[in-house]
């Protein structure tokens, strides 16, 4: 039986954070949430605050056994570039410093597969041996996540055991970005594919990624193999083209299936133009490359060190996601 502990989940009102909170509460742990908004579910104590705010972070971390840090400025058209640095770099630096000052012994950080994507070369069955890009990627989000991940790994010590999880393309209930972007465009009548449909992409359901975070938190201890390590987290089914992955969701919602496609080279040229006329848009060359070039990963290291295996099947993940997409919350 797992001993009950005290956890704070930063970003606990988000897609991943909600799933982590739910799993921790089900295991009998005491859970606190730090987020900009109040979670709909009244699972636990909530502190409304920002990870850039020293007082809010201190209040959240005080007396905790574990910090699970999922909060981030995510890749979105409305996110100012400066915010990535402020939240993903400065905010995480504050979290590390606060954990050390308050003697919080364990810290799990949610990174991203994007930290190894260089924007030029395809990745097929990538693992943790992949280096960071020799040149920083062109988008502010990926740059900030690389810096934050390096900070988190460097912070590992007997006083603060840290590890980093790198989810691949994550989806599930309350997904406003991965599923949300494609479904949102389809609801507005935009039905286009990018590329020739051969590029493959790895995915992970939010509950499975949450399970990996809980496992990582339990494994952290001075001298443990997981300390100072990064792990890719995937679902265990073959990678597929992004638009092929999205098609069953569109069908379930009676939305149009994209049949027209923009060739890769044309999409790349249009994205380069968009970077000039709409620099805050998510339609940029990096986004086109990620969609039109293979980005697949494996998680053998997480299986070995964390004992990770998905707890929700693809079929069940689809049903849960569609149920949420049909709800008023997703509109």
Regions found by a protein language model. Name each.
Residues 6, 299-304, 309-331:
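Amphipathic terminal alpha-helices
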Residues 7-27:
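N-terminal Rossmann NAD(P)H-binding glycine-rich loop of SDR-like oxidoreductase domains
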Residues 94-141:
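Conserved Rossmann-fold NAD(P)-dependent oxidoreductase catalytic core, especially the SDR/UDP-sugar
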Residues 136-163:
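Active-site Tyr-X1-5-Lys
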Residues 143, 147-148, 175-181, 195-219, ...:
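Substrate-positioning beta->alpha
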